Amino acid sequence: MTTQAIHSVLAMMNITAEQAAGNTLTLSAPATAGAGFMSELNSSIKQINGMQIEARRKAEKFELGVPGIALNDVMVDMQKASLALHLGIQVNNKLINAYQEVMNMAV
């Protein structure tokens, strides 16, 4: 897996997270050398965590009977958070495979 492919996957994760959060789609410029891969990865992990926290909060509010919280909204938010987590796990697996492939290359 090339670095371009990794950046592409991370960009798709960010777009998916933005869409799941209900934000408008914004395409950002490629990360600068200072921002780097690690900051993109941390940002994606924080977005996934934020989605899960928000889904849990909405579920708790629904369980407490707070007006304005519908079951379908709770279920959709929980599915979005679950999907984002599974996507993050798949990206993690791909990164590990890419790392192992690079480490096994003959010099």
Swiss-Prot record:
Cell compartment(s), UniProt: Bacterial flagellum basal body
Cysteine-cysteine disulfides: none
GO cellular component: bacterial-type flagellum basal body
Keywords: Bacterial flagellum
Pfam family of the protein (one): FliE
GO molecular function terms attached to this record: cytoskeletal motor activity; structural molecule activity
Spans through the membrane: none
Keyword set includes Calcium: no
Name of the protein this chain belongs to: Flagellar hook-basal body complex protein FliE
